[in-house]
Amino acid sequence: MIRQITKEFELNTYLLRKSWRGRKMYSMYKAYGLEYPFCQFFTVGENGVLLVFNSTMLIVNSAPEEADDLSAFIRMHQPFRVECDEPVRAILAEKLPEYQSLHRTTFQLQPDSSAIEVEQFVEMNPSLDDVYKILQAGFPNLQDYALWLTDTSHRCRHGISHVFTYKNSTTATIMFDIDDKVLVGQVATLPEARGLGHARAFLRWLAWFLAQFNKEAVLYALDIRESFYREIGFIVKETEFVLELKQDDNQLMKGLLDNGN
């Protein structure tokens, strides 16, 4: 049974803060609360929690016996991406042929003290207009500007997220910092700057920067980008599969870009 959460005491924030997916959900709660129609939380069975945020659905702690209810709920909402734990993900993949399973790796950022020399080229408070231009070049399915700007500026104002750029050509975002656990996302470089080592230098600096504050930082990578993060020395923390809706005509709804992958 899936039921919407409308009161704060109904949301198990302790559970959310125990996993990376849960922390992402908790960060959305901290940013938006329970009042916005595009950010809705639900209970799943006795102990599960589900978040629908724009075109992404996140689920933690759901039981396999909830798969029928979840598949019906997913068909009703038609999110672009669904993230949940095994074995529920595998069961949903069988029930939802309109979705494909994509392999995703979680990398832990590794600090490199030599990266401090590039800090002079890092913009700590860049123009969000400039950031969007970089992201557009890297993510053709990026949501439209107004939606992205509204969400990003809101999360930055509330201290949930922080955006950086490097040499006006590469960008990355701290998606959340919860209990010293940091998720980095929205990593992109302008086409004309690719191959110059900007992303490599910038991410090594970001790893070093966060380590100064005793933060454990990770980022997600689908297989198409996985080799790059191995090459720069980031460590595989875990791997999983996520569900994504197969190709359709509604490109604007594709990819909330909540993690850049």
Residue spans for each PLM region:
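N-terminal charged segments
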Residues: 1-94, 140-147, 164, 258-261
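A short beta-loop-alpha structural element at the N-terminal edge
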Residues: 1-13, 118-133
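A conserved beta-strand-loop-helix scaffold within acyl/acetyltransferase catalytic domains
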Residues: 53-54, 143-188
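Conserved acetyl-CoA-binding loop-helix of GNAT-fold acetyltransferases
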Residues: 65-73, 189, 195-210, 231
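Conserved GNAT acetyl-CoA-binding A-motif
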Residues: 76-86, 210-222
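Non-catalytic substrate-recognition and accessory regions of acyl/acetyltransferase enzymes
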Residues: 84-86, 100-114, 125-128, 133-142, ...
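Conserved active-site alpha-helix within GNAT-family acetyltransferase domains
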Residues: 87-100, 200, 223-240
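Conserved catalytic-core motifs of GNAT/GCN5-like acyltransferases
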Residues: 99-110, 235-254, 258
